[in-house]
């Protein structure tokens, strides 16, 4: 079932249906559906050419020689997967993708990333892949027959954490989006939030709103202004509004450019109205102090 009434706006509607499973007495057509679902999930919805298909593994699954779990394992260990995700990405980004592709969630804390970094360095990539698929977590949610899915985007019951839902939207950028065609490229999406154990803001997926084109400043700050006002108000509490997509002539015609406004609480509402008049999209509102 959907975890939020905003499922259609957040791009999670596709996950309101039951997971794809290879049930007893399955047919060749059922196996074909499972194969396509595994490719979509494990390869991050990246385009797969006919010549790239792992036909020998597909045949083993279709003939009942491989379980769904073992097919997922084989795809994740394949040279195809390594070429798409291991070789071109930073290691922390690879671990984020492994969590997403194999466990259907984002890392919950930095200790999980450190654990997999250590295993990859000391035992190798294949051993690290095994640690996801042979885990009690994988067994509980997917077992031998269910294709992994983004389980933190739907209500699955016990064991879910709110931080997993919000962080999923830094990795999941919409049903039609590919993990190899995102604005942030090969860099980690969650390293900063995990290192500081801070909450992750939800940014709507690609195509849903213009918020998807937002990227935070790499220096952690953005150019500031207050529409000509003083940032001092009657209350000491200030708010930082980070904005993308301002479209007036004096602003650069770059959708990813962002600007920061520091305002007191009393001016928050009027500032938001002015941002709207300027054609901007609010990416985040946080306490400035």
Swiss-Prot record:
It comes from the Bacteria. Keywords: Antenna complex, Membrane, Photosynthesis, Phycobilisome, Thylakoid. PROSITE patterns: CPCD_LIKE, PBS_LINKER. It holds the Pfam family PBS_linker_poly. It is a peripheral membrane protein. GO terms for biological process: photosynthesis. Residues 213-233 are annotated as: Disordered. It is found in: Cellular thylakoid membrane. Residues 216-233 have a biased composition (Polar residues). Residues 236-288 form the CpcD-like domain. InterPro entries: CpcD-like_dom (IPR008213), PBS_linker_dom (IPR001297), PBS_linker_sf (IPR038255), Phycobilisome (IPR016470). Belongs to the phycobilisome linker protein family. This is Phycobilisome 39 kDa linker polypeptide, phycocyanin-associated, rod. It comes from Microchaete diplosiphon.
